[in-house]
Amino acid sequence: KLLLDSGRVNFGAALDEEPKPQRVVINFIVLGVPVAKKRPRFFLRGKHVGTYNAQETEEGRLRLDIARQLPVPWTLLKGPIRVICRFYMRRPKSHYGTGKNSNTLKQKAPLYHTSTPDIDNLQKTVYDCCNQVVWGDDACVFESVSRKEYSGSPRTEITVEVFNHG
């Protein structure tokens, strides 16, 4: 089923190739320090065990920021979705010079954020906040790309790509 092009295999030219999917791209920018998903906490009150999520207000703020950027009326996305998340973390003071150079970034200051919070917990927060706001369920996400970087302005940038055949 693959066509040969001067002795080489051309993988992009299958005889009964499906039409290329159409793609819709939606971008969100949420200002503020990215929030990682935290584990629920348990407590004992008498003989009853209870749980609480210490993070509900932070998730609510993120969900509201995302919802405000959607057009009205909005229909929840369906189908295969690719999500690209870029988490920009605040730089610590140790990345900057001292004295008159206190606003100058050191030459050896790293670009990528390699400490906590973990990137998977940052993703979980974004996915949970997009459930029933942007898409119906995060099970429709077929590909996810994420990165953590340092920045002077902490924020979360989310790109959602929806693929539809036809």
Regions found by a protein language model. Name each.
Residues 1-166:
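Acidic, proline/glycine-enriched N-terminal capping motif
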